[in-house]
Amino acid sequence: KLMTAYLTFAAIKQGTIKLDQTVPVSEKAWKAPGSRMFIQVNTQVKVEDLIKGMIVQSGNDACVALAEAIAGGEENFAQMMNREAQRLGMKASSFRNASGLPDPQHYTTARDLATLAGALIRDFPEEYSKYYSLKEFRYNNITQPNRNRLLFLDPTVDGVKTGFTDAAGYCLISSAKRGPRRLLSVVLGAASDGVRAQESLKLLNYGFQFYDAVQLYAKDQPVSNLKVWKGGSSTVKAGFQGDFILAVPKGFAPRLQTELVSQQPLMAPVSAGQTIATLKVSLDGKPYGEYPVVALEAVPVAGAIGRAIDSVRLWFK
């Protein structure tokens, strides 16, 4: 449902659908098993109501209706989900439906879910703050509370999403903001609703107490100038489109080391925002994380002479 929300917000931003637009409820959406917001077949429902039903009530029916409105069908929408997962760097995920219902080819990991949740908060901050902290939603004369218990237990928690299937157990992606810092936690396979909330709160408290937020690079600060072949410019500035901040155990920041691994040969054209390198971070010589580095500017293709010269240089490289 988190990926479905991400793609829904993207579709609204692109003008594919609108918040106040009504969409038809198909029989497939109406029959969706599991948790529902109880939309009725052959009726029209506002997109914003479907968003609330999906996020607050965990409505599988709402997910199917949104998928059909955006992509014309759930299978097409699943293809969009997989493309977006690749773009976001979710390396161990495969999507087959919009709701997260069990399927042998539908899977993900805690790391990938954290990546997705972080991307949603980063890319759609207004939508996140508007919908994910809602404590209840009423539709079709039925009021359902948000299944995220932490919203009622800790005022610093403002999301994100619960999940449950017999195979996966009780799951919770949670986020809290205390002062300027925001942390995410992911708990999968808990034995009960209470356990997933308890373990999530433990993780958040531990993170805030024992980790520092360390900024390694500022937004649009060049990490390096990388060589570009056959381009109008011979180099391109590489960096991050937002402040690059890591959670690091308290007192360990001076022991971090970084290594930039570029994608060579890097050929023009290069678009701004294109991933062109990886920043490898280590702590005390042990891998700590790998993070995509993007082009901070565009580099067009060079003219015929410039391309020919670089072709010769590449031949002897």
Regions found by a protein language model. Name each.
Residues 2-114, 118-123, 137:
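Active-site-adjacent loops and short helices of periplasmic peptidoglycan-processing enzymes
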Residues 90-91, 102-107, 111-317:
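Domain-terminus/edge residues, biased toward the C-terminal soluble/receptor-binding domains
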